[in-house]
Amino acid sequence: MATPHINAEMGDFADVVLMPGDPLRAKFIAETFLQDVREVNNVRGMLGFTGTYKGRKISVMGHGMGIPSCSIYAKELITDFGVKKIIRVGSCGAVRTDVKLRDVVIGMGACTDSKVNRMRFKDHDYAAIADFEMTRNAVDAAKAKGVNVRVGNLFSADLFYTPDPQMFDVMEKYGILGVEMEAAGIYGVAAEFGAKALTICTVSDHIRTGEQTTAAERQTTFNDMIEIALESVLLGDNA
């Protein structure tokens, strides 16, 4: 049954959904990597598609920018459409000098300055972590492709334009691999509603050096990340 934000029916979505932030990136992923694709959502332009990858039914849908937006879509996919696993595939900014542009980062955990997980966890700190099996499958898929990945903590920021740039020094000290805006929220939603989640990011810009990819590159050139996500789903089926 359709929700206020997703005009689909039960069965339209696969049990696994890849979620980029940009709905146009969702369209690109569906058209480039999936077969027998059909559109299953277009409310507010947040495009969603279902198709098959090597015969396996998989969906892909955008989630927008920030924890509030991605949390709405993740929650509805899980509770209203039977989704069991969500893989966020997005971009992040690097703060460490040893993390380079276009590196692939797997978010084993996600720190945040958002208070959403404290709200759901009775004002206590909640350790927002990815599902272990999904993480291991992504690492194994990357190894099989010969892609070096970094595994560790992300930082999910509420503000894109931070008023406190000194916080980047703290992140670097604590070994944060990338800064993005959604992982901690998606991990919290998955935990609350009994699903599993993982975030895989490609470094789109470097906060220290000023290096960055273009919007067009972010939409079309992060193929390694997408292939790792898709292959990890197949590994999960065979486990």
Curated annotation (Swiss-Prot):
Q: Which HAMAP family match?
A: Pur_nucleosid_phosp
Q: What is this protein called?
A: Purine nucleoside phosphorylase DeoD-type
Task: Name the Gene Ontology molecular function terms of this record.
Answer: purine-nucleoside phosphorylase activity
Q: SUPFAM superfamilies annotated for this entry?
A: Purine and uridine phosphorylases (SSF53167)
Q: Which GO terms describe its biological process?
A: purine nucleoside catabolic process
* CDD domains hit by this protein: PNP_EcPNPI-like
Which residues carry the site feature described as Important for catalytic activity? 218
Top-level EC class as recorded in UniProt: transferase
Keywords, alphabetical: Glycosyltransferase, Transferase
GO cellular component terms, alphabetically, are: cytosol
- UniProt-listed InterPro entries: DeoD-type (IPR004402), Nucleoside_phosphorylase_CS (IPR018016), Nucleoside_phosphorylase_d (IPR000845), Nucleoside_phosphorylase_sf (IPR035994)
- Binding residues annotated for phosphate, in chain numbering: 21, 25, 44, 88-91
Q: What EC number(s) does the entry state?
A: 2.4.2.1
Q: Tell me one Pfam family matched here.
A: PNP_UDP_1
Tell me how this protein assembles.
Answer: Homohexamer; trimer of homodimers.
* Annotated gene: deoD
Family assignment from sequence similarity: Belongs to the PNP/UDP phosphorylase family.
Parts of the chain that traverse the membrane: none
Say which domain of life the source belongs to: Bacteria
Q: Active-site positions, per UniProt?
A: 205
List the catalytic activities from the record. a purine D-ribonucleoside + phosphate = a purine nucleobase + alpha-D-ribose 1-phosphate; a purine 2'-deoxy-D-ribonucleoside + phosphate = a purine nucleobase + 2-deoxy-alpha-D-ribose 1-phosphate
What is known about what this protein does?
Answer: Catalyzes the reversible phosphorolytic breakdown of the N-glycosidic bond in the beta-(deoxy)ribonucleoside molecules, with the formation of the corresponding free purine bases and pentose-1-phosphate.
Where, by residue number, does a purine D-ribonucleoside bind?
5, 180-182, 204-205
